[in-house]
């Protein structure tokens, strides 16, 4: 039944912050979404998620939760399981899809089984990566269960030896063949792939390029041949469905133009994409005619348990 605002879930708790390496990104997303939801007519409570989250939610008693958490605990199925246990409808993907997408190796297995184009990769420890080339260069080394390009190393084709890693790298690292070309991304909203964005940078699309002002330029819609645009949209939608995602997701791809459609590679699918007004997914929604408050409101009205 709709509340006084005409909304199914008039009182919303926005989860943000948390304890992962992506805390600052999450706070930015959370504050932006809170403001947008207030503009859309919701009563919003901001919640900096911590170990006392169950108690806080019991006190707040929201009709639904908007999950603006990023990284471990927030997008790996943990908080999703808590919300289902508490029977609070929530946004974005459920337990299984969130856990699969956060584990890059498991997600790749799902993608490959679905016939989606992925690149060669292996899982290795930091000691193994530093002892010798795990794959022929060029290749990329990154944590298997992190986002926002945290802890990413690129080993060039002419590298003299393996990379020297930071001492705090996690135990499980994904090492994958480096794919040259353009960085493309597609947001899926429900059962619709919105658009293709071409991410233009001076180098690797790392944490600074993603979040530093002027670090990258987003071209939406991407200037691509029609067949490549269609293929990107199709791959993102199939990836969303293969993982069992709900709400929105964003799939990142690389395109080696010299190989035509065969040069498209799916890198990963993010179940909790960045959510500031200038983030990639809201930009694509705006291209499709949805304001940021409308985009956030759609996610809240899509909320449910057992996702």
Swiss-Prot record:
It is found in: Cytoplasm. Its cofactor is Mg(2+); Mn(2+). Mg(2+) 2 binds at residues 268, 270. GO terms for cellular component: cytoplasm. Binds 2 magnesium or manganese ions per subunit. Its main location: cytoplasm. Mg(2+) 1 binds at residues 252, 268. Disulfide bonds: none annotated. It catalyses: 2 D-alanine + ATP = D-alanyl-D-alanine + ADP + phosphate + H(+). GO terms for molecular function: ATP binding; D-alanine-D-alanine ligase activity; metal ion binding. Cell wall formation. Belongs to the D-alanine--D-alanine ligase family. This is D-alanine--D-alanine ligase. It comes from Cereibacter sphaeroides (strain ATCC 17025 / ATH 2.4.3). The gene is ddl.
